[in-house]
């Protein structure tokens, strides 16, 4: 739940999602659920794999849903990252301890 709470606090911020198939998707984080399924708005897709080509029709996506199990990593801006993680850990410790 620690990551879920952190991502919920980052709604409407810019995000880059790196998928397991070497495609990176960037946009504005609109929603996340406890399974870390992510919804992104104003999507831009980039392929880092030379064998996967991104079609021009894919580049004009307004809203994209990404299944949590397909995500390799997530990149966010570092604005207050340490503060948010400490706060989320403190909340979790108070609830569990």
UniProtKB/Swiss-Prot annotation:
A single Gene Ontology CC term: P-body
Pfam families for the chain: LSM (PF01423)
GO MF annotation list: RNA binding
Subcellular location: Nucleus
Entry-linked InterPro entries: LSM_dom_sf, Sm, Sm_dom_euk/arc, U6_snRNA_Lsm2
GO biological process annotation, one example: mRNA splicing, via spliceosome
Major localization listed first in the record, in broad terms: nucleus
Domain Sm: 2-80
Signal peptide as annotated in the record: none
Keywords in alphabetical order: mRNA processing, mRNA splicing, Nucleus, Ribonucleoprotein, RNA-binding, Spliceosome
Entry similarity comment: Belongs to the snRNP Sm proteins family.
Assembly description: LSm subunits form a heteromer with a doughnut shape.
Function statement: Component of LSm protein complexes, which are involved in RNA processing and may function in a chaperone-like manner. LSM2 binds specifically to the 3'-terminal U-tract of U6 snRNA. Required for processing of pre-tRNAs, pre-rRNAs and U3 snoRNA.
UniProt protein name: Probable U6 snRNA-associated Sm-like protein LSm2
């Amino acid at each position: 739940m620690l990551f879920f709470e952190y991502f919920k606090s980052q709604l409407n911020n810019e995000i880059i999602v790196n998928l397991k198939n070497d495609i990176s998707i960037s946009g504005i984080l609109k929603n996340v659920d406890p399974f870390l399924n992510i919804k992104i708005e104003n999507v831009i897709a980039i392929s880092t794999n030379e064998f996967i080509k991104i079609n021009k029709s894919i580049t004009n996506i307004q809203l994209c849903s990404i299944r949590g199990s397909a995500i390799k990593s997530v990149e966010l801006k570092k604005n207050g990252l340490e503060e948010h993680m400490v706060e989320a850990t403190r909340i979790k410790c108070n609830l569990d301890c």
